[in-house]
Amino acid sequence: MDTAFVKDFIDNLLENDGLKLKRAIGVGIFLFNKLKEDAPDYILESLKEVDKLPFEKKKAVLREVRKFLSEYEKRKKEGNFLEKTKRKPIDVFFNPIEKVKILTKTQISTLKALGIETVYDALFYFPEKYEDKRLNTSIKTAKVGEKVALKVKVKEVKIKENERYTLEVVCTDGTGYITLKYRYKNPHFALKAFRKGMEIVVYGKLKSFKGEKYMVHPEVKSPSSEELGKIIPVYYVRKRGELQEISSKTKQKRVRTALTALSESLYRYFPEYMPDYLIEKYNFPDIALCIKELHNPKDISVNALNSFTDLYHKRVIYDELFLFQLALLLKKQEIKKEKAPKVNVDEKFLRKAIEKLPFKLTRAQERAIKEILEDLSRDVPMNRLLQGDVGSGKTIVAILTSLAVVKSGYQVAVMVPTEILAHQHYKKFSEMLKDYGVNVALLTGSLTPSQKKSVYKHVKEGNIHVLVGTHALIQDKVEFKNLGYVIIDEQHRFGVMQRKLLLEKGKGLYPHCLVMSATPIPRTLALSIYGDLDISIIDELPPGRKEVITKLYFESQKEEVYKKVEEELKKGNKVYVIYPLIEESEKLNLKAATEEYERWKKLFPDRKVLLLHGKMPDKEKLAVMEEFKREGDILVSTTVIEVGIDVPEATVMVIEDAHRFGLSQLHQLRGRVGRSDKEAYCLLVVPDEIKNEKNESLKRLRVFVKTTDGFKIAEEDLKLRGPGEIIGVSQSGYFGFRVANLARSQDRALLGVARKDAEELLKNNPNLENLQDLKKLLIKKYGDKMELSFVA
């Protein structure tokens, strides 16, 4: 590609405010033909349309093409330089950070405190944002609303003691004036910092009011500061699952200095692990250049960096998504090699069992059962996700398919996350299967030693056909005679290792596995997150179920909530009241819950009010739930009422401080009521402070009030909070993402692309021949999480 010619051609068109461009015809077609061999799709697509665009948009497209050509030349130059450098194998970069000679002991301990253990971790610990401290604008040309650095001279200092801003510093750079505004209790002490005539550099968000340009509390630097004239990377740290800017300036600077030095000295040795054809397909920069440019960017748009849309971020994000998909597909490929028990399904028998049910199955339930039974009849292990909205009847699907497995002579293990849920499942399975001679047993941590001993004995001898339990099922003492089917409820609460340990109890055969999730996940995302599983979806509710009526109240409207609760109690119905865990300390949470419990007792003195909280032992929780079912009226709880808990008489769910929950969490809570043919209500209570219609939490809650479709709610939650919130895991932990974020629509769009590319690579190269560094990186990132040892 003759970049110099094309750049000159574009410059010529854009001269004199695009005078020649106004008269030119067929510019897009001409440039398309010149660039079609080398330019990425997004450039070519815009060139196809450019001739139809209005003049200003036409200019913008040509500037974008011009920018791409400059980057292309730069990358080519650096690419040639990299080609001459001897790259190291990737495992060299898995060495401990302590081995790096250019870092001081203090720098090493600071990096380790951020969770950086290896050289690889350090090189890929990218900044979360960038500050543009290049002095490339003036007061006149700087854009209002953007953060800018301006070199100015102090013109006047004003003290305004009784006003909102007590100190104002008027400055100029010759092109215009700007006022720096400060709010100090004692503004006189700040006078020394600003002397008339002194030169300073200010950095902050430029604002404007009635033609006056100003900044509030900007950073002030001396013109000789080493930070100036650069794009400054800003690093974050993860605290309690949240990403937060490293607030200490000293620590921020130490991290920045260490990572800049490390990336500058090592980037050229980092190997290109991706297949060449993929890099060419998307015109990606070399991964080594991404490391260099993201830690120490030179001539890149800061807006592009901060919106993660520059080419270097795009490459890293694509890589993360691609590696994750590759790991999932390899895991799926590996499981298919195992031998599973072949279940001979007696269809007539099963049809009779379905006809005997006291209710009719929905079409979606019938479809899910059919898909599962087809899988069970093969000797290839089933690995299926059963997804359904709250109350859609997943448990009955699990029970009926378990019956088919037991009738074929195999045992079933059902693992659930909590004791309360284990007891409930045990009751349901026992009730539904008692007429078929199926022995169902329960195994939880709270059984006595002799009860446990009896369960171990009967499971080993094969007398127990279905064993329901918590993670107690994966203990070494639990031995099955012939385990054929494993059902795991609420997948995300179990680690991969727990699932693996349960599946390993199959004695020579790999049991079929059904994962049930009551958390609806948009299908595209489900394929990506659970890409190693096949998916069955129950997308309709049983007939007769009424939609839960959801209403939003502010604290000042609480009386209406109490009125509704009183109405329902008079009808003989039951009420849940949920409080979020707000305090850092469990003691404070417990105190808050106890106070609320006492308050509800005073409000309803003639009613039986019970308290359930997370610190209670499981036995006590069970006792409270049983009491609530039998004779309780109101249950006040700090813990999210367990998913799957079934109290048909409960018709009201009051959720205090509802803005503190994610939408998917709220949807789970709402699903605890409306489990019969009675009208049910979900009443959300929020503080008056968030009344402002622009408040994001309020906007989210209004979406929630309008829809009861879990899949739509999940879509909304995904946009707002990312998939970690929906499936209950952090993106960095479960997915291994450092930069990719599925809450960003552009990253979600890339996810599907990465999935297709990973499928294509495995189709053509199932053992990843000649891609040693890619294999090693997969093992490093996903070896333990996804049992990918076979790739090595």
Swiss-Prot record:
Summary of the function given for this chain in its UniProt record: Binds and unwinds Holliday junction (HJ) and partial replication fork DNA. Plays a critical role in recombination and DNA repair. Helps process Holliday junction intermediates to mature products by catalyzing branch migration. Has replication fork regression activity, unwinds stalled or blocked replication forks to make a HJ that can be resolved. Has a DNA unwinding activity characteristic of a DNA helicase with 3'-5' polarity.
Keyword DNA repair: yes
Temperature dependence: Optimum temperature is 60 degrees Celsius for unwinding of Holliday junction DNA, higher temperatures could not be tested, nor could unwinding of partial replication forks.
Enzyme class: isomerase
Superkingdom field: Bacteria
Pfam families linked: DEAD, Helicase_C, RecG_dom3_C, RecG_wedge
Residue ranges occupied by any Helicase ATP-binding domain in the UniProt entry: 375-538
Species this chain originates from: Aquifex aeolicus (strain VF5)
Single GO MF descriptor: ATP hydrolysis activity
EC number in record: 5.6.2.4
Family affiliation: Belongs to the helicase family. RecG subfamily.
UniProt free text on domains: The N-terminal extension (residues 1-86) is not required for DNA-binding or HJ unwinding in vitro. The wedge domain within the N-terminus inserts into the replication fork junction, where the lagging and leading strand split.
Motif (DEAH box): 489-492
UniProt subunit comment: Monomer.
Limits of the Helicase C-terminal domain: 557-719
UniProt key word Isomerase: yes
Record-listed ATP binding positions: G388, D389, V390, G391, S392, G393, K394, T395
Reaction(s) this enzyme catalyzes, per UniProt: Couples ATP hydrolysis with the unwinding of duplex DNA by translocating in the 3'-5' direction; ATP + H2O = ADP + phosphate + H(+)
PANTHER family (UniProt xref): ATP-DEPENDENT DNA HELICASE HOMOLOG RECG, CHLOROPLASTIC
Alphabetized UniProt keyword annotations: ATP-binding, DNA damage, DNA recombination, DNA repair, DNA-binding, Helicase, Hydrolase, Isomerase, Nucleotide-binding
GO biological process, one term: DNA repair
Stated name of the protein: ATP-dependent DNA helicase RecG
Region described as Wedge domain: 134-229
Record field: transmembrane: none
